[in-house]
């Protein structure tokens, strides 16, 4: 006679209660409704799943967030460049329009040039500056011949230095003030185009010592102040402009002619008082 199977009156007591909690989400699951398995395969699988998730949680890379980026909602860990993740930036490679490939492509029938008109025909198109028949802008404006002052208008012609800067530069009594000595003192540091410019002394400030100045130009105020303080002023000659030999010959002849004319006028002016006496 077969022995009857004994069944428990409370089936819930023979079941194991499992709770699932994923660290990456806020989901909590209850698997208490699952029946017990004598082989305990389910419990082993659940334990392995929990272990792997814990290992993944602790194996995440440490990311340091600055105070300015603390308000950002998500922090993306840096990723190494590999051949499988290289690609252009989004939006940098725009898809080319396929013109003349049917109306479904968007530029099929007239290719974006419209139905009729000069702009839809072949050829050079309209002229530059055309405004549809009205007087064009280049015809409405007056014609200006050249540039006022020439192409070099507004560019500096001298390296200016004031008297007050020379006073505080550390010069001693009787020293020479020139372009080279001012460079050594650090008052000027020309670069580029300014390296070819001459020196000009300006009259802002006062000077309490006697110095020797060598410059291309002096302002009116600077000249008066320096002469009053007993300084020696030397005006350096400018760089001669190159001219053709024929032009130089004509200029020399003109200078000689006007020199003779001035000498004759001076001689006549001196002889008139003697004749009247």
UniProtKB/Swiss-Prot annotation:
Presequence range in chain numbering: 1-67
Plastid listed as a keyword: yes
Pfam families, alphabetized: Ribosomal_L27A
InterPro entries in alphabetical order: Ribosomal_uL15, Ribosomal_uL15/eL18, Ribosomal_uL15/eL18_sf, Ribosomal_uL15_bac-type, Ribosomal_uL15_CS
Annotated Gene Ontology cellular component terms: chloroplast; chloroplast envelope; chloroplast stroma; cytosol; plastid large ribosomal subunit
Modified residues (N-acetylthreonine): 68
GO biological process, one term: translation
Region of interest (Disordered), ranges: 81-125
Subcellular location: Plastid, Chloroplast
Residue ranges with Gly residues bias: 103-115
Keyword terms of this UniProt record: Acetylation, Chloroplast, Plastid, Ribonucleoprotein, Ribosomal protein, Transit peptide
Basic residues composition-biased segments: 92-101
Keyword Acetylation: yes
GO molecular function (one): mRNA binding
Broad class of where this protein is predominantly found: plastid
Family membership noted in the UniProt record: Belongs to the universal ribosomal protein uL15 family.
Subunit comment: Part of the 50S ribosomal subunit.
Stored HAMAP family: Ribosomal_uL15 (MF_01341)
Name of this protein: Large ribosomal subunit protein uL15c
Name of the encoding gene: RPL15
């Amino acid at each position: 006679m077969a022995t009857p199977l004994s069944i428990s009156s409370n089936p819930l007591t023979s079941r194991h209660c499992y709770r699932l909690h994923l660290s990456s989400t806020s989901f909590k699951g209850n698997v208490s409704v699952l029946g017990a398995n004598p082989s305990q395969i389910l419990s082993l699988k659940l334990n392995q799943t929990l272990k792997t998730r814990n290992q993944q949680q602790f194996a995440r890379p440490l990311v340091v967030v600055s105070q300015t980026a603390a308000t950002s909602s998500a922090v993306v860990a840096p990723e190494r460049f590999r051949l499988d993740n290289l690609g252009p930036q989004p939006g940098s490679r725009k898809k080319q329009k396929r013109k003349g490939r049917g109306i479904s492509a968007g530029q099929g029938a007239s290719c974006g040039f419209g139905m009729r008109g000069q702009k839809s025909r072949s050829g050079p198109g309209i002229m530059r500056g055309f405004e549809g028949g009205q007087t064009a802008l280049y015809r409405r404006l007056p014609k200006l011949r050249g540039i006022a002052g020439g192409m070099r208008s507004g560019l500096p012609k001298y390296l200016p230095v004031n008297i007050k800067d020379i006073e505080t530069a550390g010069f001693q009594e009787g020293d020479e003030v020139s372009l080279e000595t001012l460079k050594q003192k650090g008052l000027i540091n020309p670069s580029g185009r300014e390296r070819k410019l001459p020196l000009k002394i300006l009259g802002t400030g006062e000077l309490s010592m006697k110095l020797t100045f060598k410059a291309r130009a002096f302002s009116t105020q600077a000249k008066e102040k320096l002469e009053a303080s007993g300084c020696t002023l030397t005006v350096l000659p400018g760089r001669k402009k190159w001219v053709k030999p024929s032009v130089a010959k004509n200029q020399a002849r003109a200078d000689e002619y006007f020199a003779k004319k001035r000498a004759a006028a001076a001689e006549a002016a001196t002889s008139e008082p003697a004749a009247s006496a």
